[in-house]
Amino acid sequence: MQIEDYLKAGKIAGEVRENVRKKDWIGSTLAEICEYVESEIIKRGAKCAFPVNTSLNEVAAHYTAEPNDSKTVSDSDLIKIDLGAQINGYIADTAVTVNYDPQYDSLVQAAENALQAAM
């Protein structure tokens, strides 16, 4: 079942990533985002592979909100959300950048273009 488990984990992680990308997070706390992502992974039949990372602005990666984290997303923020789903120990890891400040549009697009070129 190894390949099937990887594929299922990847499908779940991808679905959750796309839902996260489309959602409006302005006004949400980082802890609320983490709770949402974790519940979406579990709802689809997987477990979280690691704590959800929610990194705001200059924080490059791997910030994990504490349960009572009061940091809130504003309309001028750039947030990176890193998530992982696991099925029977087989992990899919993915991330998405959500941008609310037009001055960062070209940066986000350049990163997306680099990712697509690498794949």
Regions found by a protein language model. Give the residues of each.
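Active-site neighborhoods and metal-handling regions in enzymes and metal-associated proteins
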Residues: 1-119
